[in-house]
Regions:
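Hydrophobic transmembrane alpha-helices and immediately adjacent juxtamembrane helices
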Residues: 1-266
Length: 266
């Protein structure tokens, strides 16, 4: 399995390095965003509302939110994007007709996207620390566990999205809604406590809400495992339900596409 994953990563890396200007422009754009948020955050200096302890340093809250959102959305969209690219290049059939099991296909197709997401998401936190003295505290391992859990949950939704793309030969419209909903209602740009009861209910059904809240509790508030147990258990419940269901749906989508001979259609 590791050999196959490495082969996919090498292939995608070779493709990525052929667009070096895109890499430098993306790094520059992240630095510009971080700098802009720093100057905006100075408007809120001295903000001490007790309900919003995570937002007493708005720059730290924004940077953790954006970094995590970038990573989470990679988990959701990477597999569906990979499936569509393979379809348009006419290589999906050769990939899926090889004796590779479904989990290996899923991991291999998404591996390079996660490598990129890890690098770019880290830049938000790194630039904040290097240039604007943003300090993080708490257990890095605990924050990492929230990152992995939330990414796995969104990867399950991404598997469902990829199943849709494989069967219907088009992008999943629910992906746009999930991305916009996560950005608006998961606490990336403002505290979820500001949402009214209707939008608050939307926030509570979005996995990134619990992931971002857990990571901020750890990195910004310095909370430990006992204090962040509730959002972690919620993410585990999401994962326990979505993982077997998404793998089952993807397996059925692959079998249907093979049976109908539609793997090379797009």
């Amino acid at each position: 399995m590791l050999r196959r994953v490495r082969a996919f990563v090498i292939r995608d890396f070779q493709l990525a390095i052929s667009y070096r200007m895109e890499f430098f422009m993306r790094v520059l754009s992240i630095l510009i965003v971080v700098t802009t948020l720093y100057f905006i955050s100075r408007i809120f200096e001295g903000f001490t509302e007790s309900r919003f302890t995570q937002w007493q340093n708005p720059l730290a809250a924004w940077l953790t939110g954006l970094a995590m959102l970038n990573y989470f959305m990679t988990g959701f969209s990477s597999l569906a994007t990979a499936i569509r690219q393979e379809q348009m290049q006419g290589t999906l059939e050769s990939v899926l007709l090889t004796p590779i099991n479904v989990p290996t296909v899923i991991i291999s197709s998404s591996a390079w996207d996660y490598v990129q997401a890890t690098f770019y998401s880290s830049l938000y936190l790194f630039f904040g620390w290097l240039f604007f003295d943003v300090r993080y505290r708490g257990s890095v391992l605990l924050a990492l566990s929230f990152l992995i859990l939330t990414t796995l949950v969104l990867a399950c939704l991404g598997i469902l999205s990829a199943s849709f793309a494989m069967v219907f030969k088009r992008g999943d419209p629910f992906g746009v809604l999930l991305g916009a909903g996560s950005a608006l209602f998961s606490g990336v740009f403002f505290p979820t406590q500001l949402l009214d009861s209707g939008f608050g209910k939307i926030s509570k059904i979005l996995p990134p809400t619990y992931g971002i809240d857990g990571i901020r509790r750890v990195l910004i508030e310095g909370q430990g495992l006992n204090q962040v147990r509730e959002p972690m258990i919620t993410l585990l419940i999401f994962l326990a339900v979505l993982l077997p269901f998404s793998l089952w749906v993807f397996g059925r989508a692959v079998r249907r596409a093979k049976r109908e001979g539609s793997l090379i259609q797009y």
